[in-house]
Every structure is written in structure tokens, then in C-alpha cells.
């Protein structure tokens, strides 16, 4: 069965200035109604080049406890490499449909790798205004080049180079977060599977939408991952839920945005917060983003670290193998 891509729906919708009913969100979700219009709190910024390591640790821990979200600058990923990553990703989505479909997620696949549109079950049967491409970029034993675009030709080289940098940055951040819990610096890395932890690249492609007041690029969710490292293009759209409001997230162009995901929430026994976020769309411009999700291997059981629990602080979460946790969450099944 042929899947209709949002990129194609966008092209026809722009002519009529209307969108199909399945993309129109209920009033409790519509951005025009639910976005806070007052003063917006600034997303915490952490400068990783600051020689005062204690100051960096405090900033990361505070942001992770209060927001579950922060942005890092002077993070070590070359600006030119990020530009190239975004360039090859944009060129892929500008290819003819037949070329994009050559790396599509197979219909019977239980994995998420590949070009696609629908990701998870929506309780109201609504659709998100986004197409995506998923593929693992690390470790090499988990990489399946079947889902890496052949065009543009430099796609593979750029993504392999980016994988090295993003792994290094994520391990730096996990070390700081472990330190903030009073644990050995490799505690959270090991809790996520150590060197077998997987890095999943996702490209989100949000084409222009004639009714951005009614639709969402991605509905409200927390990430399945341990942490997520994201670089967006220049079109805003990330919204964060904090203090009972949806706020537009304003970020520094050269920064990497860090989301604390479900697995760090669980490993830290709730000390670090998993950020609830969503994505809005633009009437005239295409928004894109490149999150990399650091995830445990499928069979890895993740639950509160024993060092963080005791009689006075019992475990708040039930341990799950990551594959079971992912299945239950994506299918809206109970997690307790």
C-alpha cells in the first residue's frame, strides 16, 4: 500500500489553503490556542569551553533537573560540519519521490529505520505534519547502509564524520550528568549500554503548512532515548512545556540542543527530568531538524540505578528491556 507523504500533501494543500481533516488537531492541542503569548523564559545555555568545571556541572545539573532541556555552545562539533550535515539532509528531501522511497521503511518492519511518515499511534487518529528519515550512525556493528541515502553522494561521509563528534559530545554530557548524581563519570553511559549504546539519526522534514494554527509537526511527547542531541535549521518551531504552559523555544543558531529523555529520567530515579516538547510548523517555510537519539541496545534492561535508591528513596520506575519499553510507549500501553 502506497503511503501518502506530507511533502506531497503540502504541495497540493498550498494551492487550496486547506489541510486534510486528519491533520487538524483538537482545540486542546491547536498551537494558536495553546501557545503562551507572554514573556518567554530563556532556555538554559551551557558553555562547554568554560574552564570552571564546577560551574559547568552546576549549570547542566540545574537545567536537567528544572527543564530537562538545555543548549550547549563551544561543544566541539565544527560549525562547518553541521552546515554540511544539514545540506546533505536537505538535498535528500529535495530528491524525486522515487529516490526517497528507495530507502523507505519496509511495511512489515518492526524497526523504525528508513524514510517514512507515521511513527506512533495517535489516540485520536490524527496525523503529524512531518516526513522523516531514521538510520543508526553508531556503533558500526549496528549501521545498516540500506537506509542511508546514496544521493547526495557525500551523505555517508558527512554522517560518519558527524557520528564521531556527536558520540564524543554525548559522552562528555553523560559524564557531567553522572557526576551531578554523585556517581562515577561512566555510570550513566554504562546504564545505557556502554560502548554498545546506539546512536539513531533522525531527519525531520516539516514542509510549509497553510494552516499552522491548526496542525502540529510532532505532537507533545518525551523522547524514548537517554539523551537527544539536536540541531535545527533556521526556521523556529520547537515548543517546550514548562510551568503548565507551552513556550516557543528560542535557541542560539550555533548551539546543540540537548533533551533529557526517558531513559535518563529512569536511570536517575526521577532526579533528571525528561522534557515534554512538540513542534509547530510554518506557513511559508520548511523547517528541518536533525536529532540524534542515544539509546540502549534493544535487550538492555533499564531502571533506576541501585546506587540512587534505598529505604528512604525507593525506585520510582519499573525496569524494562528497551525494546519492550519502546513498544509499549509507541503503542500507548501502560509502563507501570
UniProtKB/Swiss-Prot annotation:
Which protein family is it in? Belongs to the iron/ascorbate-dependent oxidoreductase family.
Q: Which residues form a coiled coil?
A: none
Q: Which UniProt keywords apply?
A: Cytoplasm, Dioxygenase, Flavonoid biosynthesis, Iron, Metal-binding, Nucleus, Oxidoreductase, Vitamin C
| Superkingdom classification of source | Eukaryota
Cysteine pairs forming cystine bridges in this chain are: none
Catalyses: a (2R,3R)-dihydroflavonol + 2-oxoglutarate + O2 = a flavonol + succinate + CO2 + H2O; a (2S)-flavan-4-one + 2-oxoglutarate + O2 = a (2R,3R)-dihydroflavonol + succinate + CO2
Segments of this protein annotated with the region Disordered: 99-118
> May I have one GO cellular component term?
cytoplasm
Q: What is the lineage of its organism?
A: Eukaryota, Viridiplantae, Streptophyta, Embryophyta, Tracheophyta
In Gene Ontology terms, what is one molecular function of this protein?
metal ion binding
Knockout: what is the outcome?
Accumulation of anthocyanins and glycosylated forms of dihydroflavonols, and drastic reduction of kaempferol, quercitin and favonol glycosides.
Q: What is its EC number?
A: 1.14.11.9, 1.14.20.6
Q: What is this protein called?
A: Flavonol synthase/flavanone 3-hydroxylase
What result follows from mutating residue 202 to M?
A: Reduces activity 25-fold
Binding-site positions, 2-oxoglutarate: 204-206, 287-289
Q: Name one GO biological process term.
A: response to auxin
Q: In the UniProt annotation, what is the result of changing residue 202 to R? A: Reduces activity 8-fold
Please give the tissue specificity annotation from the record for this chain: Expressed in young seedlings (at protein level). Expressed in roots, emerging leaves, shoot-root transition zone, trichomes, flowers and siliques. In cotyledons, expressed mostly on the adaxial side and only in guard cells on the abaxial side.
Cofactor(s) recorded for this entry are: L-ascorbate; Fe(2+)
Q: Which residues bind Fe cation?
A: 221, 223, 277
Task: Tell me what the record says results from residue 295 to Q.
Answer: Reduces activity 2-fold
Compartmental location: Cytoplasm; Nucleus
Keyword Membrane attached: no
**What does the function comment of this entry state?**
Catalyzes the formation of flavonols from dihydroflavonols. It can act on dihydrokaempferol to produce kaempferol, on dihydroquercetin to produce quercitin and on dihydromyricetin to produce myricetin. In vitro catalyzes the oxidation of both enantiomers of naringenin to give both cis- and trans-dihydrokaempferol.
Its main localization is: cytoplasm
Q: What does the entry comment about cofactor binding?
A: Binds 1 ascorbate molecule per subunit.
Amino acid at each position: 500500500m502506497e503511503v501518502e507523504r506530507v511533502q506531497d500533501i503540502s504541495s497540493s494543500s498550498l494551492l487550496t489553503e486547506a489541510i486534510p481533516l486528519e491533520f487538524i488537531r483538537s482545540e486542546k492541542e491547536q498551537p494558536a490556542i495553546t501557545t503562551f503569548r507572554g514573556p518567554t523564559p530563556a532556555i538554559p545555555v551551557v558553555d562547554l569551553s568554560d574552564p570552571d568545571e564546577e560551574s559547568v556541572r552546576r549549570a547542566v545539573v540545574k537545567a536537567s533537573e528544572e527543564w530537562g532541556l538545555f543548549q550547549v555552545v563551544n561543544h566541539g562539533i565544527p560549525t562547518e560540519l553541521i552546515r554540511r550535515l544539514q545540506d546533505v539532509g536537505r538535498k535528500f528531501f529535495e530528491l524525486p519521490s522515487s529516490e526517497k522511497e528507495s530507502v523507505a521503511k519496509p511495511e512489515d518492519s518492526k524497526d523504525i529505520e528508513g524514510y517514512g511518515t507515521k511513527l506512533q499511534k495517535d489516540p485520536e487518529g490524527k496525523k503529524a505534519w512531518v516526513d522523516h528519515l531514521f538510520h543508526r550512525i553508531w556503533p558500526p556493528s549496528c549501521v545498516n547502509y540500506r537506509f542511508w541515502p546514496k544521493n547526495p553522494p557525500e551523505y555517508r561521509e558527512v554522517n560518519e564524520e558527524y557520528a564521531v563528534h556527536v558520540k564524543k559530545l554525548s559522552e562528555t554530557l553523560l559524564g557531567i550528568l553522572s557526576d551531578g548524581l554523585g556517581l562515577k563519570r561512566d555510570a550513566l553511559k554504562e546504564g545505557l549500554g556502554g560502548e554498545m549504546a546506539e546512536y539513531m539519526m533522525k531527519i525531520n522534514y516539516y514542509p510549509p503548512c497553510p494552516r499552522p494554527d491548526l496542525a502540529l509537526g510532532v505532537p507533545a511527547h518525551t523522547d524514548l532515548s537517554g539523551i537527544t542531541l539536536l540541531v535545527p535549521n533556521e526556521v523556529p518551531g520547537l515548543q517546550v512545556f514548562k510551568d503548565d504552559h507551552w513556550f516557543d523555544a528560542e535557541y542560539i543558531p550555533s548551539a546543540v540542543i540537548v533533551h533529557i529523555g526517558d531513559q535518563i529520567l529512569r536511570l536517575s530515579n526521577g532526579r533528571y527530568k525528561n522534557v515534554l516538547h512538540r513542534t509547530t510548523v510554518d506557513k511559508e517555510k520548511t523547517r528541518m531538524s536533525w536529532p540524534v537519539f542515544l539509546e540502549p541496545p534493544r535487550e538492555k534492561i533499564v531502571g533506576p540505578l541501585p546506587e540512587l535508591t534505598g529505604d528512604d528513596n525507593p525506585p520510582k520506575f519499573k525496569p524494562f528491556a528497551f525494546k519492550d519499553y519502546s513498544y509499549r510507549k509507541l503503542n500507548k500501553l501502560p509502563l507501570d
